[in-house]
């Protein structure tokens, strides 16, 4: 494992090994310090609570030092485009930035959200891939325009921890939100669920389909792992007999770069596409999951997120353990 950009870079066996390693860290059965005397650069283009805190603490618990950098705030503004004429507001090119960090650090984590402006460009993850292009040390994706693999691995770990091994009936449901959001979390949750072999239902209103190429990969991974994928446009029946409910909002590709149009189209779905007690009652005693932060009584009711079915805090904690497993695998001496 030389880098960690998406779960699809790894095999099903690799993913299960990471989960098992993360469980050992959580249970206190792995006290190794593979980062002793070593530093990791963590580059954040965007705000963060769970990713930033869990990565910084995880590096420390593995014996290492985390160097926090925020381009445009605690470091220079960055240009990533090849051949760019840098006569505007960008001070340094990723080519130098990354290679200099590689002389100081043994790995670089990068968080760079979708700007929600140009779908065809952003779906290629240009900033993340420019880091990977120029780096001589491993790159860890801490959320990009298309993928959030660390979150997805914490999600898979949480499902295993709460429900045991084996194939589960998993629902990824779109939820109403006052503005369009990036697709990285739903993309990665769906992809990892398929790789593990779960029976995946994706529920969303018409017009909120995930990327077609990615869906092809999700279906292929599910077939190889013995799982299934079913996409539905009605919310209530989607909950029937489900064991895991994962709620997340995302924007429409049809209105990418035009948020006011997306907001108008999604308006009728307010309330109906919220996880509530009535929908959860249709499930097979399902656990409720969300990556956080979550808007209460918009995405999910207080009654659900505060219930014993909710595992969102455990899910957030597991970010720490699974990222330690990722770091240990990447950087084992």
Question: Language-model segments: which ranges?
Answer:
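Phosphate-coordination loops involved in phosphoryl transfer and adenosine-cofactor binding
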Residues: 34-40, 167-169, 285
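Positively charged, low-complexity intrinsically disordered leader regions
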Residues: 1-57, 72
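Phosphate/diphosphate ligand-binding glycine-rich loop within oxidoreductases
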Residues: 33-41, 48-160
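Glycine-rich phosphate/diphosphate-binding loop of Rossmann-like nucleotide-binding domains
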Residues: 45-67, 160-247
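A short, gly/pro- and small-residue-rich
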Residues: 120-141, 257-283, 308-309
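Rossmann-like adenosine-cofactor binding region
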Residues: 220-303
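Adenosine-phosphate binding glycine-rich loop
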Residues: 285-287, 291-333
